[in-house]
Amino acid sequence: MDKLEISSHGNIESAKEFTNSLEKSQFTFCLVISYTETSEIPGITIAGADKEFLKFTSPADAEFLRHGFCKCIDSIPMSPDGKPTPALLTKASLDIAKIPHFVINAGSKIHPDVSYFDSQLDYGKNISESTALTPEKVIEAVEFGRVIGKSISKPNDCLVIGESIPGGTTTALAVLKGF
């Protein structure tokens, strides 16, 4: 691959050392997809054009990364104001850098038309009404993460994990506040 120009801000020497340490690394990208009913709260997410399309955002992102087009909907996911999914940039980056990737389904309401690791988890409930997952399901999810994390990280120098979960940022904030 040709050298890419990288701009750094802050501690330039530290940034150079870090980027140089990654130069010969083998990267793999993992997209974790899921769904939470929290995303259905009006105004909480911009991960889909409207409430009906939210459930298609994650599987469509996974399909777009794999195929270059979506199978579960007619176009890439868009925000209510017409902005395209961040998966557009992710795909371009993965393609340019020739980084292999895979998908983990951690509770998507709609299953993508791609091969994926399946956690067998249900999607999350609305956290403003109840717990998203039962304590047993949380333990199951953490254990699945540990097992698959150990397995997939071993053959890689650098595993990059991304997510496509409408309402996921709000849910993550609630979890962190709960800690």
Q: What residue ranges belong to the model's regions?
A:
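A glycine- and small-aliphatic-rich helix-loop capping segment at beta-alpha/alpha-beta transitions
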Residues: 49-50, 118-123, 174-179
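Short gly/ser-rich anion-binding loops that grip negatively charged ligand groups
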Residues: 75-83, 128-131, 135-138
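Short, conserved acidic/polar surface loops in the N-terminal third of protein domains
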Residues: 112-117, 172
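Glycine-rich, mobile lid/loop segments that gate access to catalytic sites or pores
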Residues: 132-178
